[in-house]
Amino acid sequence: MRKIEPSLVSIVIEAAPRKTPLYDEHTRLGAKMVPFAGWLMPVQYTSIVEEHQSVRNNVGVFDISHMGQFIVDGAGAQAWLNGMLTNNVDKLNAGMGQYTFLLNDRGGIIDDLIVYRIEEQKYLLVVNAGRADEDFAWLQNHLSDGISLTSRSADFGAVAIQGPRTNELFHALFGKDVELPARNHIADVPFDATNVSVARTGYTGEDGIEVFFYAKDAAKFLTAVLERGKPLGIKPCGLGARDTLRLEMCYPLNGSDLSPERNPIEAGLGFFVDLAKPDFVGRDALVKTKESGPREKLVPFRMKAKGPPPRPHKQSGNQQDHPAAPA
């Protein structure tokens, strides 16, 4: 069979980074834009250190519109998702979310994600930007009859508002009588003649929310966030601070700490795997790992003093240490 090479046109299309609904706002705010996971994203506005400290001490806002957003709908959606994801979807009531994994047949991590139950048989999956296309294809290939899987990524934007003053900014945006969702919960909240979805989640180690809205409302919402957050010391924050914040908390990064060659038990994240479930993709491989012990273990460490980046180190016998994401 003749090998079909991709055309020049397809290569150009694939290589061109996409822009989030907030791209013009980023350039207006003076952000330094870089390609990331197929998107043009702000890496910083002022300095990574300033943005990092703003989130730790006050509040910051990040564009997370590049992340994939999928809707799973239909009778049997709960049972189907429980067979595709490692955590127990049965534990979710409407309005609740949980961290979980999408695995291949060998138990390797395709992606880590958050699944929200937004109605009785309707779910929102928020996945990593760099894995979104692969995730969608994998789920599509395993789809059961009666289940609808759609991507709303092109029609929606999202921001993460993170920091100890998130609660104050939430009420400044939505009203003092509107209740902030509980941790790992999601709710629709009125905003300027429309509704936005507010989830009490984040990737920084601080209190925070992630807000999902129609792409057409993106600029208006970010403007409101920055204006009403000004008395609270808010700063727009880029990917640089997002990375240092998650690294400081030892949160894993897909593509570095997590990969299809490493399973959740080896990644030290077995807490988000429910082996009591009778079946899910990758379960058999995880049971074997549990019984025999992991071939490797991802563990956090902190440098005691300044020094060169850690390198692979053979400690004893066949054991060898490999730093996954040095700071």
Regions found by a protein language model. Give the residues of each.
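Conserved, structured C-terminal
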Residues: 2-37, 42-43, 118-327
